[in-house]
Amino acid sequence: MSSDDKSKSNDPKTEPKNCDPKCEQKCESKCQPSCLKKLLQRCFEKCPWEKCPAPPKCLPCPSQSPSSCPPQPCTKPCPPKCPSSCPHACPPPCPPPE
């Protein structure tokens, strides 16, 4: 046995990676798993992560809002926050007795 054979079988990094050049340029997830890790590291700065955009930071309605303004789940366009002029707002406090 030669030392070359040993290093090839023991070191997975020396295994040839069958990567598609087009795949490397596009940094698509269709590449072989053996190449993906290396591709992602090399292409992280080049390729925008359009396939997995960060979820929009939607602010849910305040917890004290009445049932007429339920919090809405995040959608592509962030839903508007609960309007401050909710029809079922708390009534004004009773005036002090004179």
UniProtKB/Swiss-Prot annotation:
Pfam families registered for this protein in UniProt: LELP1 (PF15042)
InterPro entries: Lelp1
Region Disordered, annotated ranges: 1-26
Family, per entry: Belongs to the cornifin (SPRR) family.
Name listed for the protein in its UniProt record: Late cornified envelope-like proline-rich protein 1
Taxonomic lineage of the native organism: Eukaryota, Metazoa, Chordata, Craniata, Vertebrata
